[in-house]
């Protein structure tokens, strides 16, 4: 029987543990701009997927996701040990890391909304002085 509430609680705790460990315990400078955004645990509590994003060194800089991915792959064993020490479960889930695409998708969605708003404004400006075709009130006797 799968306990989804327990899996959700464990995922939340794994997210907190991994984020804290990357910030305070893992001494890899390649992980400096990595942010843990979410974690998901399978129903059998044996596998956990940790989602992360990578920032650039500056606002305009492109993030180096390949370097961050390599650093996370190297630190996976150490992170699993830290998670196992802090979780009180019989079996420590295996950790896998996946780049979180939600920020890029939301930025694209925001761009689409801005484009639609601009088109609405252009249409509103175009129709401001427009008059209906035909009679003003076609139902007038």
From Swiss-Prot:
<keyword id="KW-0963">Cytoplasm</keyword>
<dbReference type="GO" id="GO:0030490">
    <property type="term" value="P:maturation of SSU-rRNA"/>
</dbReference>
<dbReference type="Pfam" id="PF02033">
    <property type="entry name" value="RBFA"/>
</dbReference>
<dbReference type="GO" id="GO:0043024">
    <property type="term" value="F:ribosomal small subunit binding"/>
</dbReference>
<feature type="region of interest" description="Disordered">
    <location>
        <begin position="120"/>
        <end position="141"/>
    </location>
</feature>
<dbReference type="InterPro" id="IPR023799">
    <property type="entry name" value="RbfA_dom_sf"/>
</dbReference>
<keyword id="KW-0690">Ribosome biogenesis</keyword>
<dbReference type="InterPro" id="IPR015946">
    <property type="entry name" value="KH_dom-like_a/b"/>
</dbReference>
<protein>
    <recommendedName>
        <fullName>Ribosome-binding factor A</fullName>
    </recommendedName>
</protein>
<comment type="similarity">
    <text>Belongs to the RbfA family.</text>
</comment>
<dbReference type="InterPro" id="IPR000238">
    <property type="entry name" value="RbfA"/>
</dbReference>
<dbReference type="GO" id="GO:0005829">
    <property type="term" value="C:cytosol"/>
</dbReference>
<dbReference type="InterPro" id="IPR020053">
    <property type="entry name" value="Ribosome-bd_factorA_CS"/>
</dbReference>
<comment type="subunit">
    <text>Monomer. Binds 30S ribosomal subunits, but not 50S ribosomal subunits or 70S ribosomes.</text>
</comment>
<comment type="function">
    <text>One of several proteins that assist in the late maturation steps of the functional core of the 30S ribosomal subunit. Associates with free 30S ribosomal subunits (but not with 30S subunits that are part of 70S ribosomes or polysomes). Required for efficient processing of 16S rRNA. May interact with the 5'-terminal helix region of 16S rRNA.</text>
</comment>
């Amino acid at each position: 029987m799968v306990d989804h509430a327990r899996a959700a609680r464990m995922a939340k705790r794994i997210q907190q543990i991994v984020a804290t460990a990357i910030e305070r315990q893992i001494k890899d400078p390649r992980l400096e701009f990595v942010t843990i955004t979410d974690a998901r645990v399978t129903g059998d509590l044996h596998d956990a997927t940790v989602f992360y994003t990578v920032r650039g060194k500056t606002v305009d800089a492109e993030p180096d996701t390949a370097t961050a991915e390599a650093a996370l792959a190297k630190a996976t064993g150490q992170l699993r040990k830290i998670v196992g020490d802090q979780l009180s479960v019989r079996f420590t889930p295996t950790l896998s890391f996946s780049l979180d695409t939600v920020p890029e998708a939301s930025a694209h969605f925001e761009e689409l909304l801005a484009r639609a708003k601009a088109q609405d404004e252009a249409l509103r400006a175009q129709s401001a002085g427009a008059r209906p075709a035909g009679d003003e009130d076609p139902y007038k006797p």
